[in-house]
Each structure stands twice: as structure tokens, then as C-alpha cells.
Amino acid sequence: MAEEQDLSEVELSPVGSEEPRCLSPGSAPSLGPDGGGGGSGLRASPGPGELGKVKKEQQDGEADDDKFPVCIREAVSQVLSGYDWTLVPMPVRVNGASKSKPHVKRPMNAFMVWAQAARRKLADQYPHLHNAELSKTLGKLWRLLNESDKRPFIEEAERLRMQHKKDHPDYKYQPRRRKNGKAAQGEAECPGGEAEQGGTAAIQAHYKSAHLDHRHPGEGSPMSDGNPEHPSGQSHGPPTPPTTPKTELQSGKADPKRDGRSMGEGGKPHIDFGNVDIGEISHEVMSNMETFDVAELDQYLPPNGHPGHVSSYSAAGYGLGSALAVASGHSAWISKPPGVALPTVSPPGVDAKAQVKTETAGPQGPPHYTDQPSTSQIAYTSLSLPHYGSAFPSISRPQFDYSDHQPSGPYYGHSGQASGLYSAFSYMGPSQRPLYTAISDPSPSGPQSHSPTHWEQPVYTTLSRP
């Protein structure tokens, strides 16, 4: 048994490479008469992948000495006697546990009892079988056994369990590495997610500061000083070049939280206008919308319309594409003075209570401005966030010629309610389709701090879906 322990240790020691060299010459003569023994002797010489199988077979062979020829055993003894075992840290190398106390293995269950006994027998009968193939075969055979065939192994496993309990009364199974690996992996994933969120927040903060910087040229632009020449006002330069990712840009600009909306992650916002009656939203437009940061611009859009930013209208239009800027915000943003050449004039009966209106998204074509005030009209008030004035890209088309920009006009308009006065959020998608979300304010008559006071509101009417 001492020699068996030495054999297992020499497999794990640096001298293990010497042992195969000694085994190979000695095992060569035994190939002829004893194919099984010679085969097992030769299997010690291949690479370390076979060491586990060779060690098992050598340990099994020590029980019956006739498995290995005399020359093999003499060669092994010669190698082991010449090696200084104090050079090898045995506890660490053999069981991998802490040096203080050796690792106690769990008692074998019934299948392990069966597999260990059957593996020895099969390895003796079929020495050429690979260990993995043996394991597969043993598993299949075990599943085919009935209860009566399994009973002896179950009884032996129970006996081993009781013996193990006697030998190690305070034994507690403590799986070591697998659990820690999973925990470490989970910890690695969590900081990754936090880092991703942190990166997104940093990008959004960057865009927010960029918009604050762009606000100052925007304050001098015609959008805020009442100059009707909006193309020159927009030539102050769009805040972002076309190559800028739209997700961060829009997340830094749009604040859907004010309407109680929750935006979806995948660019398809789940819009829940709490008290707003929405028409059917065009799926194409919604799919083209990028993700928004819900909490980013709440400071710019106070719920009750603080006079510092928006005195009487708690809304702001953020233009994110040349087309939509023309479509929506231009009449609202740029043409503030009453004398602006708008295709429409505000309806005679604009209700001061500002019923929130929506327009149905009409796939049949771009919405058109109509001159006669009707119930599906929406009076857009001037958007009074001058620091977003420069957010509009320069427009090269006539001011309200946006029919070619919008294949499907997703204006939210309802034909069943009185026309309401509210400013529009224009969230521009990548394909430059404006999406109007309306915010109503019950006091739309007060003066505005950063923009001219009440100018005549342009009235937009759109065709509803047939």
C-alpha cells in the first residue's frame, strides 16, 4: 500500500516524467506475452492527459501484482527510491486543500460504488478503452439496472456513509471552488452593468452640458428674439453632427417623464399619457424613435411651469432632425412674432383651459395645415426654452414645406375635443419624423421669461387615419 501511495505521488511530482522513461524500456519486452500488461505499461508514456487513467490502473494493478511484469515494478522501485519526496509539497499537490487540514472526500453514493468497481473490471478487460468512453458506458448501464440489481450498491453506499460518519463526526460538505467561481462571475457581471449605466450617465451628462453651451448662441438666434428668419437662426449650427449617436443625443434632450410616459429600452417607447387621449401611434415612427433618458431634463421642464424657464407653458420642443424641426417646432419655435407667414391662424375660440389634444397618426400621407379652424386643430404655443434654439439643425427648405419629409405624420390630434393650446415636444427620430407629445397647462396666458409674450398661435390640423 505504501508503494501504491508512492505511485500516485510520483504521477503528480516532477519526476513523473522520469518514470515513463524507465517504464517504457522495461515494458517493451512484456508487449508480446502480456498484451494487457504491456499496454498499461506503455500508457504511462503518453502525455499528462492520460495520467489520471494510468494512475488508477496502476493503483488497481498493485492489488494484483501479476498485472505489471517484474521489470516494471523494479523500475518503479528504483525511481521512487532515488527521489527526495521532501521537495514536493504533498498536501497542496495531492488534495489541493489547505495545508493545515487535509481534504476529506464525501462518501460515495450507490452509482459511485458501482462505477468504481465496474471501471476496474472493464479497464482490465478492455485496456484500450478511453476513460471517457468507460464513463459513458457505466452511466448507461446504471440507468438500465433495475432496483434489485442496484440494491447491493445502494447497501454498500449506505455502509460507507455510516462509516464516514463515524470517522468524521463533524464533517460538513463544503463545496469550494465552483460556488466561489459563480459568485465571482456574478460580481464581475454586476460591476459591468453598473459601469455600463455609469457610462451612459456620463454620456448623457456630456450631452447635457453641450446643450447648455449651445443655449447661449441660441438665445441670440431669431428663435428667441422674435426674428422670423428662422433659417438663419438655425444656421447657428446643429448641436451634433450626423455621425453623433442619436440615442445619447435624444436621451439628453427629451423628457418623457413629464407626461408619465415610460420609454422602452429598444427604441419603442411605451407611451402612457396619463390624462391625454392619444390617437393611434404610427408603429413605424415609434420604432424609429431612439431611447430617452427619463430623468434627464426634468430640471428644464418643471411640472408647474416655473417662470425661470417656462413661465406659462410647461413644455419645450426639442428638435432632433431637420425634417421634424420644420414639421413641428418651426412654427412653434422659430416663427414667434405674430406677423410670421404661417399657413394658418389660431382659431377664434381657443380655450384657455387648454384641453390636451392628440392627432391620429395617419399613414395615408403627411398632415396638412388647414386654414379653417376645426375641432381637430391644435394650437401650438411658442416654446420658450431658448437654450435649445441651437438644437435645431439648419433647414434648407421653406419654412413649412415638410410634406416630403414626413411619409407618415404622427401628429396626435383628436377630432372629438375642443382645440387645445399646448406646446409640442418634437422628438425627432432617425428618419426625421416628428413625434408630438402634448402637454397642457391650465394657465396659458401668462408672459414668458425667455421668449416674447403671446404671439398668435399657429393652428395645425392633420388628416386622421381613415
Curated annotation (Swiss-Prot):
Residue numbers spanned by region Disordered: 1-67, 160-199, 212-274, 354-375, 433-466
Extent of Polar residues compositional bias: 440-466
PROSITE patterns per the UniProt record, alphabetical: HMG_BOX_2
Name of protein: Transcription factor SOX-10
PANTHER family: SOX100B (PTHR45803), TRANSCRIPTION FACTOR SOX-10 (PTHR45803:SF6)
UniProt-listed SUPFAM superfamilies: HMG-box (SSF47095)
Membrane topology: Peripheral membrane protein
Motif segment (Nuclear export signal): 134-145
Consequence the record notes for mutating residue 174 to P: In PCWH; without Hirschsprung disease; reduced DNA binding capacity
